[in-house]
């Protein structure tokens, strides 16, 4: 996994665990799936998941509001819902910005 702007997938994470931890590919895949499932289950229950030196995943409630259809301009009600938010830790922010370079942007 390099900083080339590539999208990292579950398969990439499983391969990294396989390479760095020494578990079999099957065990690595099961490990990654278990961690992701645990994070998902906690978020579904409305719990905050805090990973030290990485960041926090949390669920926030958004109330009902009035939005606008961009094509027609008509107002439409947007129902209340829950959204997931990720807040990076200060350590992660520092590591990302350590070189002072801007993050790569997606261009067409």
From Swiss-Prot:
InterPro entries: Hist_DNA-bd, Histone-like_DNA-bd_CS, IHF-like_DNA-bd_dom_sf, IHF_alpha. One of its GO terms (molecular function) is structural constituent of chromatin. It comes from the Bacteria. Pfam families: Bac_DNA_binding (PF00216). Disulfide bonds: none annotated. Keywords: DNA recombination, DNA-binding, Transcription, Transcription regulation, Translation regulation. The keyword Cytoplasm does not apply. One of its GO terms (cellular component) is cytosol. Belongs to the bacterial histone-like protein family. Heterodimer of an alpha and a beta chain. NCBIfam families: himA, PRK00285.1. This is Integration host factor subunit alpha.
């Amino acid at each position: 996994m390099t900083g080339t702007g590539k999208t990292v997938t579950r398969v990439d994470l499983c391969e990294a665990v396989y390479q760095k931890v020494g578990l079999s590919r099957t065990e690595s895949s099961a490990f990654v799936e278990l961690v992701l499932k645990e994070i998902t289950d906690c978020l579904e229950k409305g719990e905050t998941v805090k990973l030290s030196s990485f960041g926090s995943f949390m669920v926030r409630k958004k109330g009902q509001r009035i939005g606008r259809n961009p094509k027609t301009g008509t107002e439409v009600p947007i129902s209340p819902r829950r959204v997931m938010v990720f807040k990076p830790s200060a350590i992660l922010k520092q590591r990302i910005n350590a070189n002072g370079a801007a993050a790569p942007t997606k261009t067409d």
